[in-house]
Amino acid sequence: MKLIYIFSLVAVIAVTMIPGIMGEAEAEGRPPQIGIFDQIDKGMAAFMDLFKG
């Protein structure tokens, strides 16, 4: 039961926070930066650059 409560809380926080982050990023004309996802995106871009050309 506690796990369901924790997952529900995390889901509610994610649903309420992510649109705000996306809106701020759009207003400033930059890609959204959400902690670990931003780092993964940078890593994948660097990895793809290795095979470009």
From Swiss-Prot:
Subcellular localization(s) per the UniProt record: Secreted
Keyword Signal annotated: yes
Keywords carried by this UniProt record: Amidation, Neurotoxin, Secreted, Signal, Toxin
Annotated protein name in UniProt: U13-myrmicitoxin-Tb1a
Cleaved signal peptide residues: 1-23
Keyword Membrane in annotation: no
Modified residues (Lysine amide): K52
Gene Ontology MF terms in the entry: toxin activity
Function: In vivo, this neurotoxin paralyzes about 70% of blowflies (L.caesar) one hour after intrathoracic injection, when tested at high doses (45 nmol/g).
Residue span(s) of the pro-peptide: 24-29
Tissue: Expressed by the venom gland.
Origin: domain of life: Eukaryota
GO cellular component terms, A-Z: extracellular region
